[in-house]
Amino acid sequence: TINYNPQRTRFRKQHRGRMKGISYRGNNICFGRYALQALEPAWITSRQIEAGRRAMSRNVRRGGQIWVRIFPDKPVTVRPTETRMGSGKGFPEYWVAVVKPGKILYEMGGVPENIARKAISIASSKMPIRTQFIISG
């Protein structure tokens, strides 16, 4: 398993920000032959990333290689239940990756196209957004 929390960050809490526009970086296939590309903006949690990676690796078995192209580096804070408003921001609860349209989530290589298509479609069903399967070249 991959550790999906940053080792150390400069600040413990972040603003939520907003996801405008499209992804200009990380939208080309760099490592593999097939890839899963996001079509919508979203926050993708570290658990969702890991679930997608596991689903893919279970499908390709040996021979295939998988690259995860996103990393959750944004802390999301949650305040305790039944707490009144005010008294500061909540505590960091989990990490998310900010994904914009066009961003490549996973890449895969070393397997035939039909197996890659099947594995990536299973991984895409774990994602909270619409995605598309793309082939390099």
Swiss-Prot record:
It holds the Pfam family Ribosomal_L16. GO terms for biological process: mitochondrial translation. GO terms for molecular function: rRNA binding; structural constituent of ribosome. It is found in: Plastid, Chloroplast. Keywords: Chloroplast, Plastid, Ribonucleoprotein, Ribosomal protein. Coiled coil: none annotated. The keyword Plastid applies. GO terms for cellular component: chloroplast; mitochondrial large ribosomal subunit. HAMAP family: Ribosomal_uL16 (MF_01342). Part of the 50S ribosomal subunit. Belongs to the universal ribosomal protein uL16 family. This is Large ribosomal subunit protein uL16c. It comes from Vigna unguiculata (Cowpea). The gene is rpl16.
